Amino acid sequence: MPSSSPQQPLIRSRDAALDLIKWLALLTMLIDHLRHAWPALYFLYVPGRLAFPLFCLAIAANVARPTVGNAGGLSVRYLGWLLLFSLISEWPYRLLVSNAESLNVMPTLVLGLLIANAAQRSDIQVRWLGAGALAVAVLAHEWLMFGAFGALLPAAFLLALRGPRALWLLPMVCCLAANYWAPFYVDAARGDPFAWSVLGMCLFAPLLGLLLLRLRPPFAVPPVRRWAYLFYPAHFLVLAALRSL
C-alpha cells in the first residue's frame, strides 16, 4: 500500500495506532466473554461487538503493510500462528461455551487473511488460494463464527484502507451482515433498545477502528506481540475456572 496516498493511513513498521486497536480488540473480547461466566452480564454483548471487526482491521493493516511477507502481503509465519491457535483454542472455547454452534473465531480469521491477501496481490497462486478460502467460507458458513461475511470483513477493510472514505461503508455493512441474527431485527422493529444498541455498535465498530488507525496516539502504547495468540485460549480456560468456583 503506497504510503504517499492521501486517502490511506500510514502503516509503519511498528504502528502505535495499530497496537492500540489490538489492545482494544483484546479488551473488548474479554469483556464480551465475561457473560459466558456470569450470564447476568449479558449486556456486555454490546461492547463486545467491537472485538471482531477490530481484529479484522488488524489483519487488513498487516496485509497492507509493505514489509510483511516476501512480496508485501501474506506472512507464512503469521498464517501459521493463526492456524496453530485455531486448533489449540477449540477445546478451551467449548469448555466455556458448551452450547456453541460454531467454531472458535480463529478459523474465520484464517480464511479472512487468505481472502484479504488475494485482494491485495496479483499472483495467480495467491488469487486461487483466496478463491478457495472464499469457497470454504461460503460452504462452511453455518459453522464459522460470523459466517462468510465475517471471512470477507478483512478484505472489506483492506478496500477501505486503499480507497476513498466512501468505501468505509463496505466494512460497516459487512460487519452488520456478519453479526446478522434474525431475532435482533424483530426486536429492533419493536423498538427494543438493546437490539438497536447491538446493531448500532456493529456499524460503529469499523468506523471507530478506521478512525483510530489514522491517529497517532499521544501516549506510549505497549506492543502486542505473539503472547496475544496464547491469550485467546488462555482466557477461555481462566473464565471457565472462575465460573466453576
Task: Briefly describe each language-model feature range.
Residues 1-245:
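Alpha-helical transmembrane segments and their immediate juxtamembrane cytosolic regions
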